[in-house]
Amino acid sequence: MYIPNSEEFLKGIKEYRKYEKRDSMYKVATFLVSHFWGKFADMSDGLGVILLTWNQAFYRYGLLDFDKLESFLKDNFADIEYFRKRNIFSFEANDYEKIKNLFNELLIATGINSDKSDSKTSPVSVAKSLHILCPEFFPIWDTNIAKSYGYNYLTSPSRKYLEFSRDLKELANKIKGYEGYPLDRPLIKLIDEYNYSKYTKGWI
C-alpha cells in the first residue's frame, strides 16, 4: 500500500478544499444526522443530502427510497451507535461480522428500482452513509479510490470494504504523527480528501 509523505498528504487536503465545492453538503449532512440523532426519518433525510449530491450519478437512474433507509436505521441503531463511539484505530477482526451485516443491509436500503441501469445497488452509497453515521470509524471510497487500493467491489463488496478499512487503519496509523494537517475533520475524512484529490481527480 502506498503511503504518502506529510507534504503530499497535506497538498491533497489543500487541493480538495480548493476545488471541491460540494463539500458543504458534508457539513449539512453531518449536522442533520447529529442534530436529529435517534429520530430516524430526519436522520434518513440527512443521509439523503450526501447521497443525492456525492453519488448523484447513481441516483439519476432511480429514486432513493427514504422509507427503506429509515427502516435500516431503526433496525440497526444499536450497532450504529456502537461504531459511532469508536475511531478507525480501534478497528479489529471482531468487528467483521457486524460491519458485514450493516454493509449488506445498507446496500439494499440505499439501492434503486430502475430499468435504466444494470446496477441496482451502490457500494459507494453504503460507504458514504456509514461514514456520515460513524465519521471517526468508517472510511469513504469511490470506484477510483477502491481500485487504487486494489479493490474491485463488483463482487463481494462487503468483504472488499472490510479489507479496505483494514488498509486505512494501517494508513491512519502511519500518518497520525504528521504535523500541520487540519483538525476540523476526523482523520479518516482527511484521508478521503487526500484520496479523492489523488485518485479520483488527479489534482496531485
Which role does the model predict for each range below?
Residues 125-132:
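Short hydrophobic alpha-helical segments that form membrane-spanning helices or hydrophobic packing faces
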Residues 1-117, 135-204:
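An N-terminal alpha-helical hairpin/helix-loop-helix interaction module that forms a charged
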